UniProtKB/Swiss-Prot annotation:
GO-annotated biological processes: lipid A biosynthetic process; lipopolysaccharide biosynthetic process; protein O-linked glycosylation; response to iron(III) ion
Gene it is expressed from: arnT
Coiled coil: none
Family: Belongs to the glycosyltransferase 83 family.
Leading EC class: transferase
GO function terms (MF aspect): 4-amino-4-deoxy-L-arabinose transferase activity; mannosyltransferase activity
Function: Catalyzes the transfer of the L-Ara4N moiety of the glycolipid undecaprenyl phosphate-alpha-L-Ara4N to lipid A. The modified arabinose is attached to lipid A and is required for resistance to polymyxin and cationic antimicrobial peptides.
Recorded metabolic or biological pathway in which this protein acts: Lipopolysaccharide metabolism; 4-amino-4-deoxy-beta-L-arabinose-lipid A biosynthesis
Organism: Escherichia coli O45:K1 (strain S88 / ExPEC)
Short name of any one Pfam family annotated for the protein: PMT
Name used for this protein in its record: Undecaprenyl phosphate-alpha-4-amino-4-deoxy-L-arabinose arabinosyl transferase
UniProt GO cellular component terms: plasma membrane
Membrane topology: Multi-pass membrane protein
Amino acid sequence: MKSVRYLIGLFTFIACYYLLPISTRLLWQPDETRYAEISREMLASGDWIVPHLLGLRYFEKPIAGYWINSIGQWLFGANNFGVRAGVIFATLLTAALVTWFTLRLWRNKRLALLATVIYLSLFIVYAIGTYAVLDPFIAFWLVAGMCSFWLAMQAQTWKGKSAGFLLLGITCGMGVMTKGFLALAVPVLSVLPWVATQKRWKDLFIYGWLAVISCVLTVLPWGLAIAQREPDFWHYFFWVEHIQRFALDDAQHRAPFWYYLPVIIAGSLPWLGLLPGALYAGWKNRKHSATVYLLSWTIMPLLFFSVAKGKLPTYILSCFAPLAMLMAHYALLAAKNNPLALRINGWINIAFGVTGIIATFVVSPWGPMNTPVWQTFESYKVFCAWSIFSLWAFFGWYTLTNVEKTWPFAALCPLGLALLVGFSIPDRVMEGKHPQFFVEMTQESLQPSRYILTDSVGVAAGLAWSLQRDDIIMYRQTGELKYGLNYPDAKGRFVSGDEFANWLNQHRQEGIITLVLSVDRDEDINSLAIPPADVIDRQERLVLIQYRPK
């Protein structure tokens, strides 16, 4: 009976966090709009080999993540939930692997359930796991690969070991097809310390080639297909997207070595109080094979990405699966022996909630700021933000009422965030970061446009997805579409600022021409170097400028 209650509680938890509130949040640009539009175009064109964005070749990532996203939109429609369905599914599958692996290590159902709940409620997991990017997919394949390797190394027969390594190769292959060759480097680095300390080199060398073969066979069909269709794909993807992105001096998203320290601290909420103890307990019990495996799995990818020049918070998502298991194991021991860390965790959550309440007041219309984040007419959004932090503080307090028993309720600290964040985004943010909001405000003007031009790839993708058209033209800036625009068949998909007046004269009689520009808040749109327009509609950071046939 208790198991049934636990399952009902888990499914209710998942529904409140990962299902019910998702449609209330508009898509963010540039990431969510980009991946939404790539998958929409894949479904519309039926081309499941070559990824396209705005009808242009888009070689920044391989294909597998787009497949899953496309299936999500195919099943649930071209809506906010459909766009995010793939990442939510991947996150829940990863949580299922956390459950299975914890059971495999400790044979404790309560511990497995707690590890799962901790994982799903970690701030970084929830933030990325409900956000339409490719990182939850690669995190799933990496976690699946680590589970497969453990399964192989614990097997007692050659059949079991062979099956485990074959499965490892498949997960690595799918990882390569999702985000590239990092799916090979990260698992290898993660297992090496464990293999070395356990002296398991023999099994690795005897059976490792099976993983290599299954990985190659997994990638080969699509790899050959895209090489035949687009011979330049692999050169661009390997050199630009791997070497330049991570290693060279001009790497994308450059950041210092310590970049991930605040990411781990913030990402560990609402379980931050368990982080030091979980890592220390893991190190203290390093003679235990499973603990060494989890520690290595957590730390090695973190060190790898810290050394790399290019960094983003999403890169270390897979590290939080083993960390959640270590936290759950440590929390049960602490509840039984010394609940100090659990009390500290409760106070951290109270402090975070109270700080959020104060910060919300400071940036509200009634605070001391001359330019508040919310305007007076957005009062309900301020109250939503207050509710988010009030619930966080409340559940932090509740965990302290009987800490040995109530500490798991820290998982409910982000409940207000999950349910209300979509209702608390300020209009000034929505107008620049949510193209859907702009489209809703200007739908009647946009719909009949013969040509639409914009200077932002993220906005272009949002317009294309919302309007169900992939012929948006880039104006002045090419951004990440620069490579695709270099192909001969992309001629006419970019108009420079100097060419715009002539281009306008040539095409004006064909129908309404709409220009959507991103501007600074204090920028005078009358000073823009463009021909006089028939219509100008400014929505804070985005401006609709329209030219009608003469």
